[in-house]
Amino acid sequence: MQKLIILLLVAAVLMSTQALFQEKRPMKKINFLSKGKTDAEKQRKRSCSDDWQYCEYPHDCCSWSCDVVCS
């Protein structure tokens, strides 16, 4: 009976330390249920309004400064 109690206490300590370490680990963003961008969202990103517009890919660039950032 005493061995069982000691075993349960050791298991509880190990589980609590594991939970503490997992809590400190940075959480990754999970987007497997999110949908992709719509055509309107893609088009909005491509239509640059100024020289410093953000672009993701080289074919999204609308100006020379944006092209330099993408390259």
UniProtKB/Swiss-Prot annotation:
Propiece residue ranges: 20-43
Subcellular localization(s) per the UniProt record: Secreted
Tissue spec: Expressed by the venom duct.
InterPro entries attached to this UniProt entry: Conotoxin
The keyword Phosphoprotein is annotated on this UniProt entry: no
Annotated S-S bridges: 48-62, 55-66, 61-70
Molecular function terms, GO-annotated: ion channel inhibitor activity; toxin activity
Entry similarity comment: Belongs to the conotoxin O2 superfamily.
General function of this protein: Inhibits voltage-gated ion channels.
Domain description: The presence of a 'disulfide through disulfide knot' structurally defines this protein as a knottin. The cysteine framework is VI/VII (C-C-CC-C-C).
Protein name (Swiss-Prot/TrEMBL): Conotoxin Vc6.12
Species lineage: Eukaryota, Metazoa, Spiralia, Lophotrochozoa, Mollusca
